[in-house]
Amino acid sequence: VIFDVLRNWLEHQGLRVRLVRNITDVGHLTDDSDDGEDKLLKRAKVEQLEPMEVAEKYFWSYEDAMTALGVRRPDISPRATGHITEQITLVLDLLERGLAYESQGSIYFDVSASEAYGELSGRDPADLIEGTRVATRSEKRDPRDFALWKAAEKGHIMRWPSPWGEGYPGWHLECTVMSTKYLGDEFDIHGGGLDLIFPHHECELAQAKGADKPFARYWLHWNMITLGGEKMAKSKGIVIALVELFKKYDPMAIRFHLLRSHYRSV
């Protein structure tokens, strides 16, 4: 809703806006580090569906809810699974520049070699040591390093061929690739929830700058909707589906309610 208002205002000012909203249909693991299970695969097992069936189901459910709230669709909705070649190309570029390394069929971004890492969140990379939401994997040189490409384990359904064997892209990689493909190496605004500043957006920026892409000029982060004092999240079972709210309240009333507060307030 926030981005819809911003888009409308910018267009009202006479500016031409291209809005891109990516669809993460592979690579988003259940842990912010490089451990855990792909969220889409996990959901597919629960619902006994193919991963792409799950992606389609929730994509259209989300689109229907946004339409009810009066949110216009983006100009482009690229999917991570449709941009595997471009993601491999960026990994090869970062390897050539000495900003990444291969380990057991996976490729990791070398945080120690990046001048940009920590720039967005204001965190000192040296302070990110073991035990601070950074998992230690034996195949990493440094626990702070993050996956660009993951080797597919036996039985992993979503996998693609690559120069390093079959695998799948890391969560951060796809966003850097798709945003720069459709908006250029430098674009105006990148947004998301406050919880994405670190590590997700931090990693996106490090990847982009590592490939000499200036990336976003401005960052817009909004706060989370809370329920009982906790952030609403499916992973914690703290969630109310919009479709359920629509049964009780007019969607425009919900839109108005969401816009009553500053976008960074709780």
Regions found by a protein language model. Name each.
Residues 213, 221-266:
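Catalytic adenosine-cofactor/nucleotide-binding cores of aminoacyl-tRNA synthetases and other
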